[in-house]
Amino acid sequence: IEDTAYFMWNGDNRLAAPGYEYRSMYKTRACYPKTAVLAAATGWHLSLWYRTNRFCGACGERTVHDEKERMLRCPSCGRLIFPVIAPAVIVGVIDGDRIILTTYAGREYKRYALIAGFTEIGESAEQTVRREVMEEVGISVKNITYYKSQPWGYDSNLLMGYFCQADIPEGGDGHLTIDRQEIAT
């Protein structure tokens, strides 16, 4: 990136190299500059894709790198294999001057986070926003507005960011019904 080369080591044997250090992939999230974080996440994403697609899922033949674009190709059956990118949403749910923040249940990540989740087959991103908010905190939303997106290579995702308003009925108390399997607080 720019004039800096980044490398990923996949082996178990760590080589001592002056000026270099080994870091857990998930701990790179807090690193700076953010271009280095993007490089690490993208490298991780591609490494996982290469490792899990060494053989064709249709016929079992060893795959080869395509010379024209980022894909693998099966020389036997001709199947084309592209990197897997799972669409997901991350949602800022606003209620007046408040925003819903959660902490995940049963995960290593313990900081506050916005509601997030994967888009299912046949579902638009906006439908995902509605479903995820309803599943995780039990409220309806309105005025869903796209904000921006970012690659999230740690989990092979493309995160699409949205803001929306909590749709609390007149006289409703706005009580949240938390899915304790997903959300701790």
Predicted segments with their positions:
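Acidic, metal-coordinating catalytic segment for phosphate/diphosphate chemistry
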Residues: 40-90
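Glycine-rich, flexible loop/turn motifs
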Residues: 45, 70, 115, 174, ...
